[in-house]
Swiss-Prot record:
Protein name: NAD(P)H-quinone oxidoreductase subunit 4L, chloroplastic
TM segment ranges: 1-21, 29-49, 63-83
UniProt function note: NDH shuttles electrons from NAD(P)H:plastoquinone, via FMN and iron-sulfur (Fe-S) centers, to quinones in the photosynthetic chain and possibly in a chloroplast respiratory chain. The immediate electron acceptor for the enzyme in this species is believed to be plastoquinone. Couples the redox reaction to proton translocation, and thus conserves the redox energy in a proton gradient.
Enzyme class: translocase
GO biological process: ATP synthesis coupled electron transport; photosynthesis, light reaction
Chief subcellular location: plastid
Membrane topology: Multi-pass membrane protein
Amino acid sequence: MFGHALLLGAFPFCIGIYGLITSRNTVRALMCLELIFNAVNVNFVTFPNYLDIQQIKGEILSVFVIAVAAAEAAIGSAIVLAIYRNRESIRIDQFNLLKW
């Protein structure tokens, strides 16, 4: 049963990594990053349940990661919207605005 839970976390993680590497669209890259965060949360909840039942550190860490992911999504969406207003494009390879 432990292996099934790890596969449940590893499968979306691999999909998110693949999507993050191959995507040209910024919104798709942000969605893949959120998928990676959710896969990590599944593993954070899975490990404490099989190692020690008395501790809830995995669940607390998972809630913290959800809060950080929500802030990352809000800031990332705001940056994408600001760049879209200036450049009229959301393609990753055309984002050279933040280089200078």
